[in-house]
């Protein structure tokens, strides 16, 4: 929903523009296929790429109102293992614990047994919207659903460590091609979009010198 909304608004702003959007976790895709830009969470150490921060990767625990209404158990640290969980499977993530920050103290919580385990985030998000269970999600990716009341944050006083994904959203492009005006425009648009939602970072003034 997040990327679809960004692209729809950007295309409305520039009607003559054509976009090709591919969804992949492979950072090498941009080097191998000639893509102009990729969006990446966390550090990017792939040789030959330039990375620009465009947003903050804040993580939250979310659920649908329907799930919360059908489950009388409280959503707190003591009852987490009794809930239905939707869990994202990724080789970069810790398979045993989540790390939370609570009042400046780092807390580790052992993973519960998931009701659904998947390597596809969109599939898990669809199940969260359908009321199947709790989901740990990047807040920028679920903000439209939070705004619409389709999802709500639970345990908001707990800050989740973004783990191996890092605390920034990066716009990444090949150094040998530099960035075209279209790529510049999209990065600035994306940064403004995220800033409007409280998850953006200002594009540096030096950006225009590239």
Regions of interest found by a model, annotated:
Residues 22-118:
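Acidic, Gly/Pro-rich loop/turn segments at junctions of secondary structure
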Residues 16-18, 48, 82, 148-151:
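A generic structural signal for alpha->beta connector loops
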Residues 1-2, 71, 95, 181:
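Residues that form or flank phosphate/diphosphate-binding pockets in enzymes
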Residues 148, 158-210:
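C-terminal effector-binding regulatory domain of bacterial HTH transcription factors
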Residues 1-47, 203-210:
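Central regulatory/effector-binding core of bacterial HTH transcription factors
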Residues 108-153, 158, 162, 171-173, ...:
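Hydrophobic hinge/microswitch elements
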């Amino acid at each position: 929903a997040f990327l679809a909304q960004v692209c729809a608004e950007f295309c409305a702003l520039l009607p003559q523009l054509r976009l090709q959007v591919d969804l992949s976790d492979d950072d090498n895709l941009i080097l191998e296929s000639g893509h102009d830009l990729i969006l990446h969470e966390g550090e990017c150490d792939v040789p030959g790429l330039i990375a620009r921060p465009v947003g903050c990767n804040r993580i939250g625990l979310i659920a649908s109102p329907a799930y919360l209404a059908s489950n009388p158990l409280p959503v707190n640290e003591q009852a987490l293992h009794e809930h239905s969980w939707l869990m994202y499977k990724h080789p970069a993530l810790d398979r045993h614990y989540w790390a939370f920050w609570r009042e400046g103290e780092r807390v580790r919580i052992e993973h519960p047994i998931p009701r659904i385990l998947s390597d596809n985030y969109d599939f898990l998000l669809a199940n969260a919207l359908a009321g199947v269970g709790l989901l740990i999600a990047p807040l920028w990716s679920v903000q439209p659903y939070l705004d619409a009341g389709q999802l709500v944050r639970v345990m908001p006083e707990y800050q989740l460590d973004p783990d191996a994904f890092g605390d920034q959203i990066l716009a990444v492009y090949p150094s040998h091609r530099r960035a075209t005006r279209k790529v510049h425009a999209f990065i600035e648009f994306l940064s403004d979009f995220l800033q409007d939602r409280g998850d953006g970072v200002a594009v540096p003034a030096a950006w225009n010198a590239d």
